[in-house]
């Protein structure tokens, strides 16, 4: 099946809607909210759409969640770094388990590092750099487990 721009935009819109509708399923951990559905969608976007659609979807979803009051500013670095890394990993490897590891590393380590200046400068929260890595890992791990199960059952 040829994936046209219209098809990709439609799938992206549906996945963004799933993330926004499932926003109440977040779990507070530390200064952030763990949102496993975002990480499931990041992996699905990597496999179905590619890295740049994934980053765009993560941005739009985070923006909508912040505007609705169901997310924090920390949603941006975690979801976008995870989406970019897992998208790039899948683009070049076509390996779903490796893509899931990319999502875990991108969200927890890279997203956690990028969250520090946002928390310190924009939110006024003083913390050490590694404070955000563990909560982001917990959130990403939940979504990654769901994604591995889902992709194993539905994708070839």
Predicted features along the sequence, with ranges:
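Loop-helix junctions at membrane interfaces
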Residues: 1-153
């Amino acid at each position: 099946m040829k994936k046209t721009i219209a098809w990709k935009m439609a799938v992206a819109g549906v996945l963004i809607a799933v993330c926004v509708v499932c926003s109440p399923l977040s779990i507070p951990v530390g200064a952030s909210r763990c949102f496993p559905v975002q990480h499931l969608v990041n992996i699905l976007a990597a496999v179905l759409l590619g890295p740049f659609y994934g980053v765009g979807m993560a941005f739009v979803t985070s923006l909508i969640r912040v505007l609705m009051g169901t997310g924090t500013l920390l949603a941006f670095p975690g979801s976008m770094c995870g989406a970019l890394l897992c998208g790039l990993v899948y683009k070049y490897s076509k390996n779903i388990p490796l893509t899931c590891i990319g999502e875990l590393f991108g969200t927890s380590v890279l997203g956690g590092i990028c969250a520090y200046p946002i928390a310190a400068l924009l939110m006024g929260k003083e913390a050490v750099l590694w404070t955000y890595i563990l909560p982001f890992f917990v959130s990403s791990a939940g979504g990654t487990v769901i994604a591995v199960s889902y992709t194993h059952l539905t994708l070839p």
